[in-house]
Amino acid sequence: MEPYALTMHELHDLLVRKELSVTETLTSFLTRIETLDPRLNSYLSVLAESSLAEAGRFDRGERDLHASPLAGIPLAIKDVLCMQGTVTTCGSRILENFVPPYDGTVIARLREAGAIFLGKTNMDEFAMGSSTENSAYGVTRNPWDRERVPGGSSGGSAAAVAADLCSGSLGTDTGGSIRQPASFCGVVGLKPTYGRVSRFGLVAFASSLDQIGPITKDVEDAAILLQAIAGHDRRDSTSVDHPVPDYRASLREPIKGLRLGIPKEYFVHGMHPEIADSVQRAINVCLQLGAEVGEVSLPHTGYGVAAYYIIAPAEASSNLARYDGVKYGLRVPDARDLIGMYRTSRSQGFGAEVKRRIMLGTYVLSAGYYDAYYTKASQARTLIRKDFLDAFDSFDALLAPVAPVPAFKIGEKSDDPLQMYLNDALTLPASLAGVPGISVPCGFSGEGLPIGLQILGPHFREDLLLRIAYQFEQATAHHLARPDSI
């Protein structure tokens, strides 16, 4: 089997046993990227020279392959994470030449673990989108059907993993941007608890929602990646100093006796019937594994979309105010005055969806509308969080669909922002509540499109989610499927 087709843990075993060199491994991936990625556009930049140089250090014995399970492993990084000396665009024209002078915390931790960075992946501009159609650098295509979207905003990261263009990747999840593309592309995607992973070096969209997490080929790989990046960071004031368990240690524990809740509000009217069928079959697998299953209500789920699309744009309008053409980013030439330079740089640098959300956020924060919109949205968020806390009093975890439909056609929802936003209805509540969630492959539609099972758990119980997902994965074969032709 080619190195690019292996999981991270399989690949690392071969590297440690010297059955493969790290240079051979990197060459395998780089050749595949050169051949296939022009059809997918999952990468915005490929770091061939630096990655091969790092591989050489391992092969010469200058770095130790035994140092960690990530030593010598080729990863892709969503282009919203600062990497020293590497262009970081956030999928936006306004940052097309921005080179960060430092590594974000997760990048620094992965470097220390010995991971090798293949490149930066495409994304919806500033992580605002659900399809990776909003990138200033072109749409990313789904490896299972190149006429369809890979999901978003971490679509490039998910597509790269699904197409074997990296061993694993990092994405970010503000309202579903790891879980939904993982579902659409048939891979594993984990959104950790808010505060579990440092956001230092993450270009902010909505600071109270953004979270970094792994996208991988299987659950064990997700545990390995999370192990490397989780933990307190004093440079991030929202990082929580909470013990980090050994995420691989509990993977093989049976789930017999666990109480799994099925939120009735997540099986919405208009859901694609094959989604509901696949999730029901996944629930039956968990029953066969000895779990106890029961219905639960999350009564304020219906307010999630409205609350999110008030809170997130409000935070974005503040965070994106820094892009004015003065310190960094696009600056238009020949502006007549300072205000004209601000206006023209921002209007030319930002795409349509980003402008829409900035305007929405500015509106809901304005004096006459703050109480009517932002305050009520914050109250709804509190109620949604309480729904989850109440549910976890009775259940260990929740099982649900990730999205109401499989991957949709490119351009199908582009002219209807509301329909695009509603596609996030099943992932937004967990983001608003700050609880962890994982998407694991659980089936395929009649058209051969992947479908994901969403598992949600209490704050800081990523270990439990990984255990449930792993046991489900071992009882099924959905995660082993790969696109036939790209």
Swiss-Prot record:
Pfam family, one: Amidase
Subunit structure: Heterotrimer of A, B and C subunits.
Protein name, as recorded: Glutamyl-tRNA(Gln) amidotransferase subunit A
Superkingdom assignment: Bacteria
EC category name: ligase
GO biological process: translation
Task performed by this protein: Allows the formation of correctly charged Gln-tRNA(Gln) through the transamidation of misacylated Glu-tRNA(Gln) in organisms which lack glutaminyl-tRNA synthetase. The reaction takes place in the presence of glutamine and ATP through an activated gamma-phospho-Glu-tRNA(Gln).
Annotated family: Belongs to the amidase family. GatA subfamily.
Protein's organism: Syntrophobacter fumaroxidans (strain DSM 10017 / MPOB)
Keywords for this protein: ATP-binding, Ligase, Nucleotide-binding, Protein biosynthesis
InterPro entries: Amidase, Amidase_CS, Amidase_dom, AS_sf, GatA
Keyword Ligase annotated: yes
EC number(s) on file: 6.3.5.7
A cellular component annotation (GO) from this entry: glutamyl-tRNA(Gln) amidotransferase complex
Catalytic activities: L-glutamyl-tRNA(Gln) + L-glutamine + ATP + H2O = L-glutaminyl-tRNA(Gln) + L-glutamate + ADP + phosphate + H(+)
Active site: 78, 153, 177
An example molecular function term from Gene Ontology annotations: glutaminyl-tRNA synthase (glutamine-hydrolyzing) activity
